[in-house]
Amino acid sequence: MGDKRVVLNKDIFFQRAERLYELWETGQVGLDSVNSIAVAYGDSENPYTKSSALHSWLFGHEINDTALLFLKDHIYILGSNRKVEFFGTVTGVQYNGRVPPVSTLLRDKSDKDAGNFEKLIDYIKRAEGDLGSFVKEKFNSDFVNAWNDALKADDINKTDVSLAFMHLFAVKDDKELELVRKSAQVTTTSWTAARQRYVEIIDSERRVRHSVLSSEFSAYMKDPKIQQSLAKYNADTCYDPIVMSGGNYSFKWNHDNSEAHLHNQFGSIITSFGARLSDYCTNLTRTMLIFPSAELEAAYEAILAAEFAVIAALKPGVKLKDVYKIGVDTLTEKNPKLAETLNKKELGFATGIEFRESRLSINAKCEEVVKEGMVFIVYIGVDSIPNKNKGEKGKPAAIAISDTILVKAEGDNEVLTEKAKSRLKSNVIKFKEEQENRETERDTDQKKLLGRGQRSVVLNDQTRNKTTNEDLRKERQKELGKQLNLNAKARLSKQDGGTDEKKVKKSNVSYKNEERFPQDTDVQKMLIFVDRKYDSVIVPIFGIPVPFHISMIKNCSQSVEGDFTYLRINFATPGSQVGKDNAQFPHPLAHFMKELTFRASNIKEHHSDATPPSSNLSTAFRQIKEMQKRFRTEEAEEREKDGAVKQDKLILSQNKLNPKLKDLLIRPNIIQKRITGSLEAHTNGFRYTSLRGDRIDVLYNNIKHAFFQPCDNEMIILLHFHLKNPVMWGKKKYKDVQFYTEVGEITTDLGKYHHMQDRDDMHSEQQERELRRRLNTTFNSFCEKVSRLTNDQFEFDSPFAGLGFFGVPFRSATTLKPTASCLVNLTEWPPFIVTLSEVELVHFERVSLQLKNFDMVFIFKDYKMKTQMVAQIPMSSIDKIKEWLHTCDIWYSEGIQSLNWAKVMKTITDDPEDFFENGGWTFLDAESEGEDAGDDSDESDAYDPEEADASDGGSSSASDEDESEGEETESDDDEEGSLDSDESEGKDWSDLEEEAAKADKRREVEDGGRDRDRDRDRKRPSSSKAGPSHKRRK
């Protein structure tokens, strides 16, 4: 089991065990005579066995030296002490009445488990019938060999149940498909790096052996720089990556990579590899064509068409032999000669925990039927393809294409490795050679301008097809736009069509009955009385004491004029409060009193009176103010509690090895003093405990997003939890909580003297680097332990620093970084978090060539939510953001103007049917279509350095040019047009940019010379010293 502490996922175990017993009850696929199934597992040279697959499928891990016995009424597990503890969560539990209870037996090594084997064999004999097992599997384990010897000694009749478990493993559940998709992502990411590696090798003409490249590609699976967030899964390879070129090709999966050098001049390079993530396999095979002939390109297209036909034919209910026939027929139709050298053994096979399931092979004899949820590796390989180019008799080439696909009942099957493009133009490498014969003088000038040409690699989709990729992105955006309107219309139609209910102001009754009405002397004397107990003010109106709740009093004021004191009370009435928190009154059509004014004398009426009559007004004024302040504070606390939830009780784990981080600070300042504490993971949540003893609990089921941001290029390292529902801590509710540690010095003494070779500074920098490395390792280890503790149900997401861009989400400029599911800024406070799954669309505002910045607006699927804006994003980031949104399948639009989104969203929510009948969100795309037309016209007037130089030369020396020079310029223009057409076919963007840069630099030099001439003219002596001008000289 390894050194890492693992936990058995109880739910997955019982759900999959239930599937096993359901299949067993049917008595199909060889289980009709089986009354018990025994599986003993140990070390084996073969990594793909049914025994190991059963362990991974049920337990999530391979557990050596254990024996499993499945009976109709019981499950027995034999293992060591530590392994028995692993199964503790499922022992003695009967799940759903279908899975029998589980019991564990502790191994006894003193008698080499003879007693335990005797018990298990006794259970098998009582069950009667045959014993199901994987008969053909062999292990290098004394434990497994002893178990097999014990079965032989008792003459137990065995039946091979491999076919039954093949059917059981073939159809994947949702958890399995999630792992398969991640495995495919690792595979395609590794291919992207491998493809770039081929380009570097061929461009530099390096000699690299096939075996060396195989080792490099294998390392790509675990390289954090390549896999980024997927590196934490520690994916392995399904087999040693296969690299073939130079005529030595084989379609066997156990092919040994030769020590020969990669043939990088012409022909084909075949690469096959696959990732194995959490024991689930995926695979892809790609063929790079180097300087191919037209025949070789046609062969590639035919083989690709055959692969597409096989993928389309893999639908539920279809026999695999029929799928095979469709693939062969398609290739024969496209190119009959290729069908003769096709690898006809099979055109693919099912995959999963086992890389290759031979019983589910796409061949001419397989009678098995395709089912929804199966995962297949489709593989089309053709050998001995003639490869003649440029008169050279090249070695025969081979082409192989493979992808991993998921079978779906409706719609097209999902190609899991689709990101590794298999189309021809993405896998063709051509050379751009220096043209040696230059016939015209203009060609010589052009050569001087561009510099000496060099041989370089040009991927076919690097030049002309870059525009194609942009077109594909636009096409995809159009599809997303159409789907967006359809989905939004359907979603809003399911919701209630009524308008939003306005918030009704709470109706506060001062006294619910007469018994509670106070009988104070002030009330009897018709004076103003402030009742603190019931938050009411009793005032006399026409000789009757009338109570008003403090919530109905808007404000009050007191003034002294002469011998009288005035108290003015203003009441809250409909329409008197303006703002977003304005609430509707319970009875808005009733009659309301707007204000009351009371007057009292400042002079005592009798000498015996202790106070003048106005003292009642002064006392009432003071008490009303105090009561208003207290009531509004209580109201604010009630509003703060609105929407907050009470979390479940944290279940503390008594395990001393719980994941724990120390010396952490917390944001926001839930704890008054800025003191550190520790964060510990428990059974159902986290607990943060400060040094002072303050405790803050965060439960797993209330965490919407969990982020881990390393301290690379940051001053803090942090863990951030974005909650589903706000939680009350103290008297405030919070939806975000962050635990962090500061790294290095945030402030620097600018007055301190520094020397570049100061040993203290060098030592402190080295210490800071070591601290950063240690903190990253510690935090990353904490996240991995939490994932294992929760059986991968709780994972931390990390921002992608390479995709970050600057923007202003609130008041200050920050770096916004995408994650797998969000766009975040966690360093500044308050944090900025946008969940991408909640985003309907993104609109870019103020997009113009004249502006350096633009704004980005997020519109959410819940149209009642306020839109989120990120302002002041540099224009240089717009292409990167568009590509990121495109990969996330989020529709975006752009425009020059800034929109009033509050009014736009109100218009939509008031009448959504009319909005979508008039085109829906396409009104945002109207400007972009017009801009596209403008872009096309701009592209037709593309910049050309020669044309620019010709125009500059003509304007600067028009008076001195003769007719012959003008004729030469015209001829140059004609030649220039032909050059442009050549450039569109051969030059890539990097060359054109270099060409434009050199032309700009040369023109700057010429302009600088003319500027210096003008400066010298300004500094010449005056005419009194230099004599009269030429015009005045006679």
Curated annotation (Swiss-Prot):
Transmembrane annotation, as ranges: none
Region (Disordered): 433-511, 926-1034
Stretches with biased composition (Basic and acidic residues): 433-448, 463-481, 493-503, 984-1020
Keywords assigned by UniProt, alphabetized: Chromosome, Coiled coil, DNA damage, DNA repair, DNA replication, Nucleus, Transcription, Transcription regulation
Predominant place of localization: nucleus
Superkingdom, taxonomy of origin: Eukaryota
Cell compartment(s), UniProt: Nucleus; Chromosome
Molecular-function GO term, any one: nucleosome binding
Listed Pfam families: FACT-Spt16_Nlob, Peptidase_M24, PH_SPT16, Rttp106-like_middle, SPT16, SPT16_C
Gene Ontology biological-process annotations: DNA repair; DNA replication; transcription elongation by RNA polymerase II
Residue ranges with Acidic residues bias: 926-950, 959-983
Residue spans of biased composition, Basic residues class: 1021-1034
Keyword Translocase among UniProt keywords: no
Annotated function: Component of the FACT complex, a general chromatin factor that acts to reorganize nucleosomes. The FACT complex is involved in multiple processes that require DNA as a template such as mRNA elongation, DNA replication and DNA repair. During transcription elongation the FACT complex acts as a histone chaperone that both destabilizes and restores nucleosomal structure.
PANTHER family referenced in this protein's UniProt entry, alphabetically: CDC68 RELATED, FACT COMPLEX SUBUNIT SPT16
Subunit text: Component of the FACT complex, a stable heterodimer of spt-16 and hmg-3 or hmg-4.
Family membership noted in the UniProt record: Belongs to the peptidase M24 family. SPT16 subfamily.
Designated name of the protein: FACT complex subunit spt-16
Organism name: Caenorhabditis briggsae
